[in-house]
């Protein structure tokens, strides 16, 4: 009978990464509605981001005119 060969550490397969996919703000809000509603800080952050987006859109619109 032969001697059993000791197996090395089993390596897991890496998951495929599709770059740094960032979910759109609206989707994130939909997914985490309960948490957001319960947390005033998160609500403030979201309103700030929406305001920033709005000001960016307005400035882009003015530049194209």
From Swiss-Prot:
It holds the Pfam family Fur_reg_FbpB. The keyword Magnesium does not apply. InterPro entries: SenN/SenS. Keywords: DNA-binding, Transcription, Transcription regulation. The keyword Transcription applies. It comes from the Bacteria. Residues 11-31 bind DNA. GO terms for molecular function: DNA binding. Regulates the expression of extracellular-protein genes of Bacillus subtilis. To B.natto SenN. This is Transcriptional regulatory protein SenS.
């Amino acid at each position: 009978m032969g001697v059993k060969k000791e197996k090395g550490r089993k390596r897991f397969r890496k998951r495929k990464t599709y770059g740094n996919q960032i979910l759109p703000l609206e989707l994130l809000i939909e997914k985490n509605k309960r948490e957001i509603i319960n947390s005033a800080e998160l609500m403030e952050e979201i309103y700030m981001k929406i305001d920033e987006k709005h000001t960016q859109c307005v400035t882009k619109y003015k530049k194209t005119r």
